[in-house]
C-alpha cells in the first residue's frame, strides 16, 4: 500500500484547465521522478502494491495511479464518488483525471462501517483489520480528506502520522493545552543576550497572547480549503 503519490512527472497531462492555470500564473513545476519509479529502483515490485490511498485528490498528492498495475486499487475518502465523478475529460473544467481509476477498483472508505471506530476524536478505519494502519477522517481541506496512523512499534505502541493536508504549518496545532508555550526553556537557545525568558518572548508575539492556543488558524481565503471551519475542526481533533 502507498499513501499519496506526490506530483506526477508529466504534470502537463493533468486536466487542461488546471495546466492552463499553472502556466498562466507564472509558476514552474519540475518533477524528476515519481513514486512508482522510486519503488522499482529500490527493488519493490509494483505488482505487490495492493492499493494507492489518496489523502485527497489535489495534484500534489494524487500523482498518476496509472503508473501502477490495474491490480492496484485506488482508495478515496467519503463523498469522492458523489462530488468528483464524473471528472475530466467528461467534465472539461474538472481538475481530476478519470484515467486515475480507469481499469482498477475505486474504493471509497466508509468510516461508519464494520471497520469503523474512534481514535481520539477522529472517525477512524482499521485498514488491514489488525491495528497496523488506520485511516482518519479529517475533512475540510478537500472532499473526503483523510489522514492516517501507521504503526511503527507494537510494544510500546508508537505510530507515525501521515497528515496529508490536515494542516499546512505547525503553528496551526501548536501550542496547545497539551503542549503549551513553556515559561522557561532549558537550555536557553538565546544564551545571555536577553534578560526575558524565551517563553515570554514567544508569548509576546503570539496573536492572542495565549500560551495554550495555536499561533494560526486555517486561512479563509478562497481556494485554499473546501471548508475552512471544518478544516479547523479537524486540526482541533489532531491537537
UniProtKB/Swiss-Prot annotation:
Zn(2+) 1 binds at residues 56, 58, 141, 165. It is an enzyme of class 3 (hydrolase). GO terms for biological process: secondary metabolite biosynthetic process. Transmembrane segments: none annotated. This is Gamma-lactamase MBL2. It comes from Gibberella moniliformis (strain M3125 / FGSC 7600). Keywords: Hydrolase, Metal-binding, Zinc. CDD domains: metallo-hydrolase-like_MBL-fold. Induction: Expression is induced in response to 2-benzoxasolinone (BOA) exposure. One of its GO terms (molecular function) is hydrolase activity. Zn(2+) 2 binds at residues 60-61, 165. Fusarium verticillioides possesses 2 unlinked loci, FDB1 and FDB2, necessary for detoxification of antimicrobial compounds produced by maize, including 2-benzoxazolinone (BOA). The FDB2 cluster arose as a duplication of the FDB1 cluster with rearrangement and expansion by incorporating additional genes. Its EC number is 3.1.1.-. Gamma-lactamase; part of the Fusarium detoxification of benzoxazolinone cluster 2 (FDB2) involved in the degradation of benzoxazolinones produced by the host plant. Maize, wheat, and rye produce the 2 benzoxazinone phytoanticipins 2,4-dihy-droxy-7-methoxy-1,4-benzoxazin-3-one (DIMBOA) and 2,4-dihydroxy-1,4-benzoxazin-3-one (DIBOA) that, due to their inherent instability once released, spontaneously degrade to the more stable corresponding benzoxazolinones, 6-methoxy-2-benzoxazolinone (MBOA) and 2-benzoxazolinone (BOA), respectively. The gene is MBL2. Disruption phenotype: Does not affect tolerance to 2-benzoxazolinone (BOA). Belongs to the metallo-beta-lactamase superfamily.
